[in-house]
Amino acid sequence: VTFSILSVCTGNICRSPVAELLLAQSLAPFGDVHVASAGTGALVGSGVPEQAQRLAAVEGIDATAHRARQIDTAMIREADLIVTMARDHRRLVVEALPAAMRRAFTLRELARIADAVETRLPQAVADAGASTPEQGMCAAIGLAAALRGTVEPPATPDEFDIVDPYRRSDETYARSFEELRPAAYKVADFLTKAARAASV
């Protein structure tokens, strides 16, 4: 059984494809994980801008083959986890499919929750009866959803968002990437720990 992740931003050319590829690269060794991305207002068929490609390359990621696509309800329905680049995208996802509420987080929000709840992961995985890496990852998302309301919010809600660098300066691309990268790795680490806990 595959654990599927959908990464969402606006155009599906800067933030969500880079998050998709970072997560896919980090999680590939730990289970059958399928990561995809889409945009709420996608520049369909467009590639990743050169600035974002260069930043991704630093992490060993080749983003040249990516082509933007528009999100649809089926993609949301099929995903075990939806990570969005900003609160607006999360809202649009949940409006499109209210049942996705428990599976939809902004990337930085989920990273913050993961930080606060990861000590409870082994118990959550055991309570869920998870015996495969993919079931462990599902248990991790269940835990994050259940405890979302108990995690102290950031000083400003903007800290849940990753800045959109499209058509902006190289500095903005760099800032966007610096917001995205640690959050993606934190989420990957959280899911990896859950996968390992289930496989023990």
Residue ranges and their predicted role:
Residues 1-79, 87-102, 189-199:
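Conserved active-site segments centered on acidic
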Residues 94-200:
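Phosphate-binding/catalytic loops
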